[in-house]
């Protein structure tokens, strides 16, 4: 509930302040969070980045090797394979505004330059989160937000590590607000 309530407030802020830029979700899974973003912004494109087939073995290996995530966790969530892009698109109120970017991120980054007003990152693992921050944060318009899921999830230590490593790369701290949802979502403002 808290995550969706926070999303509602962020959407109000973006609308009230006329923040330009598109929408994106990195780590779409079955599209429930994306669906809400799409419904609230009929005039914006929504970029949907996902393998639509579960975690990539390269990212799993990095998390296990660095003790960010235990192998049993991947078994418990069945690698989030229970999805496909057609299932996601059918949930959308404005499906024509959706741009599916199926495959391994960051290989699926759009060729054209896109700026964003709202991005959800919910891919659980260190490398795609770090790559997501590298791509999205510089392209966020002032007044825009990134919602990063699982920031305080004890089983997913790579999420917080990716944020810290990104801050080291750019040489400064991000404007971050943790929210008290069950997985410890982090809101990053620009």
Model-predicted regions and their roles:
Residues 1-6:
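Conserved SAM-binding loop and adjacent beta-strand
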Residues 8, 17-190:
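S-adenosylmethionine/decaboxylated-SAM
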């Amino acid at each position: 509930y808290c995550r969706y309530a926070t999303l509602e407030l962020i959407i109000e802020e973006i609308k009230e302040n006329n923040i330009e830029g598109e929408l994106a979700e990195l780590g779409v899974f079955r599209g429930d969070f994306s669906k809400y973003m799409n419904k609230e912004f009929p005039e914006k494109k929504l970029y949907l980045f996902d393998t639509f087939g579960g975690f990539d073995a390269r990212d799993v290996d990095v998390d296990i090797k660095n003790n960010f995530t235990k192998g049993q966790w991947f078994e418990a969530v069945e690698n989030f394979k229970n999805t496909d892009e057609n299932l996601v698109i059918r949930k959308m109120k404005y499906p024509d505004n959706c741009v599916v970017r199926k495959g391994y991120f960051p290989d699926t980054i759009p060729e054209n330059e896109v700026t964003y007003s709202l991005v959800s990152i919910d891919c659980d693992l260190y490398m795609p989160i770090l790559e997501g921050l590298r791509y999205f944060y510089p392209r966020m318009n002032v007044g825009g937000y990134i919602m990063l899921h699982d920031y305080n999830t004890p089983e997913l230590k790579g999420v917080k590590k990716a944020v810290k490593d990104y801050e080291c790369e750019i040489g400064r701290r991000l404007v971050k607000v943790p929210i008290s949802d069950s997985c410890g979502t982090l809101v990053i403002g620009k």
